[in-house]
C-alpha cells in the first residue's frame, strides 16, 4: 500500500505547521483497498496520535466500503454537505449506512456537520436542520452543527492557483468561515 514505506516517512510538511499525506504519491490503489488493508492503514494512522492534535482523513463523497471503514474507525466525524438535494440525500445515506454497522456506536462518536457553499448563514442552518431532523426521526440520533462556508469565488481562484485559501486570501468570506469553524 505504501510501497514498503512507513507512514511517518510519507508525511509531507505543509504551511503553517500542517502536515499531510498525499494520496497521489505514495499510496497505491487507495480506492481498491480490502478490509485488511484498510485496517492496516487505520492502525498506522493511530500511531500518529501522539504527534498531532488532530488527524483529518478526507474520504471524499460516497458510501463506498473504503469510506465506511475509515468513518467507522473515527472517534469524531465532520460531515460536509451542500444545499443541493443530492448532497443532502448522500449525507443521510452515509449516516444511515453508518448507523447500520455493527461496529458503530453513536454514543461514542461525535458527528458534526458543515454546510458548504451555502448562500447565507440561514441557508447553512436550513441544510443542517434538514439532515438533523431526519437523523433524529429515523436513526434516533442527533448531529452537531459546526457552521457554514459561504459560496465564495475566491475558493475557485485559490484552487486554480493551487494555494491554500486562508493564505491566498485570508479576508475572503470562506476563509473567515473556516477560521470561525476551527474555533
Language model regions located:
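A cross-taxonomic marker for long C-terminal extensions/tails that follow the last structured domain
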Residues: 160, 169-183
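Switch/connector loops and helix/strand junctions flanking conserved nucleotide-binding motifs
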Residues: 29, 121-125, 155-158
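Short hinge/gating elements
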Residues: 114-116, 162-168
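Amphipathic alpha-helical transducer elements in NTP-driven molecular machines
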Residues: 4, 8, 38, 42, ...
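Beta-strand-loop-alpha "switch" segments that mediate conformational coupling across diverse proteins
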Residues: 137-165, 178
Amino acid at each position: 500500500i505504501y510501497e514498503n514505506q512507513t507512514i511517518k516517512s510519507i508525511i509531507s510538511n505543509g504551511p503553517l505547521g500542517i502536515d499531510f499525506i498525499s494520496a497521489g504519491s505514495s499510496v497505491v490503489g487507495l480506492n481498491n483497498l480490502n478490509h485488511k488493508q484498510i485496517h492496516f492503514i487505520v492502525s498506522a494512522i493511530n500511531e500518529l496520535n501522539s504527534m498531532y492534535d488532530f488527524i483529518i482523513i478526507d474520504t471524499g463523497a460516497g458510501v463506498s466500503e473504503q469510506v465506511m471503514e475509515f468513518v467507522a474507525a473515527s472517534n469524531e466525524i465532520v460531515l460536509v454537505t451542500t444545499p443541493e438535494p443530492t448532497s443532502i440525500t448522500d449525507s443521510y445515506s452515509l449516516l444511515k449506512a453508518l448507523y447500520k454497522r455493527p461496529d458503530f456506536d453513536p454514543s461514542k462518536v461525535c458527528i458534526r456537520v458543515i454546510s458548504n457553499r451555502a448562500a447565507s448563514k440561514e441557508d447553512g442552518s436550513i441544510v443542517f436542520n434538514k439532515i438533523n431532523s431526519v437523523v433524529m426521526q429515523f436513526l434516533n440520533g442527533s448531529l452537531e452543527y459546526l457552521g457554514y462556508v459561504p459560496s465564495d469565488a475566491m475558493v475557485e481562484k485559490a484552487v486554480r492557483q493551487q494555494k491554500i485559501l486562508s493564505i491566498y486570501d485570508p479576508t475572503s468570506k470562506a476563509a473567515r468561515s473556516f477560521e470561525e469553524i476551527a474555533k
